[in-house]
Amino acid sequence: MFDVLTEVYSGSSQINSMFSNYIIFLFSSPVLSNFGLYLEYMTPERKGKLATVLSKRQAGLAIVMENVHDPHNIAAVMRTCDAVGIQDIFILNTKIQSHKKFGPRSSSSAAKWLTIHHYNDAGICFLELRKRYSKILTTHLATDSVDLYEIDFTQNVALVFGNEHEGVTEEIRALADGNFIIPQTGIIQSLNISVACAVSIYEAMRQKKAAGHYQQPSLPKERIDGLMKEWGFYEKKV
């Protein structure tokens, strides 16, 4: 059967179109996916692209969003995280309901390439963050806040961004290691959360690149293998 499918899949575009849904169904089934058979039918170019992306994912950098109301802002943060190479995003909702989707389809497409951790308990969320990251910093203007450019992003760091109206709550600031600010010289001393996140993590990327963190895989091999299979499945659904 697999020889027949191979011949069909490598045939004309018209035949591919006729049988694509059938092949997708077969190779997304639990039995076949356990053996990674869907990856066999991914093009070498696509496999190479996914492998390259995964090799640059940064295990030592994460974003936490606390009670962010607008799903479009969450979607924008996700797209920037994917661009920088952040795999893990933590969404903490202690005051609002969890979002069922993040913005329009075109803007939320980055979500399927990321690992989204949902929490509604701040204490449990921070227990997990402490296992992974040596420093947790919140975006908050205070007398003890450090400048973004003073943060050592060669360490394992998680950055916390608050919602659009109140910022990071006092509860979360008490759980974190400190606060940081993005230096500004304008009249309006605030940025949209998606803009603030982009500015912050591109500084992290700059430091990590200079330190050689993008030159070798950061994620454990078993996680890279798992994500490769997961991403292969998504590619069959697109």
List where the protein language model places each region.
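Short, intrinsically disordered low-complexity segments enriched in Ser/Thr with adjacent Pro
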Residues: 3-16
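Post-transcriptional modification and biogenesis factors for structured RNAs
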Residues: 22-238
